Amino acid sequence: MPAVQLLLLAGLVWGAGARTAQLRKANDRSGRCQYTFSVASPSESSCPEQGQTMSAIQDLQRDSSTQRADLESTKARLSSLESLLHRLTLAQTSGPQEIQEELQKELGTLRRERDQLESQTRELEAAYSNLLRDKSALEEEKRRLMQENEDLARRLESSSQEVARLARGQCPQARDTSQDVPAGSREASQWNLDTLAFQELKSELTEVPASRILKENPPVLPRGEEGDNGCGELVWVGQPVTLRTAETITGKYGVWMRDPKPTSPHTQETTWRIDTVGTDIRQVFEYDRISQFVQGYPSKVYVLPRSLESTGAVVYAGSLYFQGAGSRTVIRFELNTETVKAEKEIPGAGYRGQFPYSWGGYTDIDLAVDETGLWVIYSTEEARGAIVLSKLNPENLELEKTWETNIRKQSVANAFIICGTLYTVSSYSSADATVNFAYDTGTGISKPLAIPFKNRYKYSSMIDYNPLERKLFAWDSFNMVTYDIKLSKI
């Protein structure tokens, strides 16, 4: 009975939700009372056939499969969430030490990255600094070349004007050049000391006097210092003999030498070479034997503690003597100990292109060696650009004696000293130049000469005398050459 009541209640509820629901009661064939109710389908106007029933069942199966797939996907997501929750739970339950270790690892990684960035920054800064230095060096070289170009242009213009004047027959009359010219003579007043081109044109005819040059009582070089050493006056210079040619552009001009007073372990064969093209000249190449020098195999390379200037260096009694770059200071560098033993500023000496030889190259201060010792050739404002000679103490570089000549330094290409006498060369680029002046420190007298001198390669940037070998050493446009000489008897 309760089941019947529940059935009736369900029918009533369904009937309340559907207008087509009907409740009927009737006796069956056996006389029992039966209650029935019917509800109209909301989407079907009539009962489906058997095929339609199967289609509906298939639709239900598809829906069931879809729901099952959704359920599996939901289960997978729930599983993933459970795994994540488990990891979070483990992380929360981990001790502070584990967390600290993880943080330390991360911090170490960040530090390594920071160090790498700082290293890259330093490398970039160093590269930038190098570029700035190279730029400064190039600008300095550019300024120097522009200055030389301006000087050459002025000299060319002056030479052209002087040639035109000479062509018009306005040249002053030449006088007897065998006599010394007093500083205050009338003939001297006819010369313009500031016109370099004129002096070069007339250098083979007469000396060029400068005011306040010759002293009334010039110091005399003691003959006892010379002794019987075969000294005499230069009368002949032979043809150049080429020993070696520089391999690179840095060998355009330079200086090479041997020690006329060698000290152990060096011998009279030991040769030194310095390429002087560049802004920071520090390398000195040493060759134990002449054959090594000719073949280009140095036995040692010195690195100077300070850059040298131009081509005026010499080696004497085991030390290299050179002008410090950008200064009027002469430096003595002892080769055996590779240390600086003495430095001396030459009072009033021009430097950095103030009073160079005619070829330029910052050749303001030129060191030289002869039978009597160590010399320095330079000029000063007081001498108005005329060559000044000073005898140097080879130990401490103190100036022992000084002579002022009447030869304009910028009017000659180079100079060397033999037996206490200064000799100058007329041109660095003419194939047929001359040794055109001589100044005797023993008498204080200068005179013109005309001894042929060959510039085979037409760019002689260095000429020095070696008293031990009685030869001239020269650097002529990448080529290292020697000249035999002859001296007359005194």
UniProtKB/Swiss-Prot annotation:
The record marks 212-213 as: Cleavage. Palmitoylated. Glycosylated. Pfam families: OLF (PF02191). It is found in: Secreted; Golgi apparatus; Cytoplasmic vesicle; Secreted, Extracellular space. A motif (Microbody targeting signal) lies at residues 488-490. Homodimer (via N-terminus). Can also form higher oligomers. Interacts with OLFM3, FN1, NRCAM, GLDN and NFASC. Interacts (via N-terminus) with MYL2. Interacts with SFRP1, FRZB, FZD7, FZD10, FZD1 and WIF1; regulates Wnt signaling. Interacts with SNTA1; regulates muscle hypertrophy. Interacts with ERBB2 and ERBB3; activates ERBB2-ERBB3 signaling pathway. Interacts with SNCG; affects its secretion and its aggregation. This is Myocilin. The lineage of its organism: Eukaryota, Metazoa, Chordata, Craniata, Vertebrata.
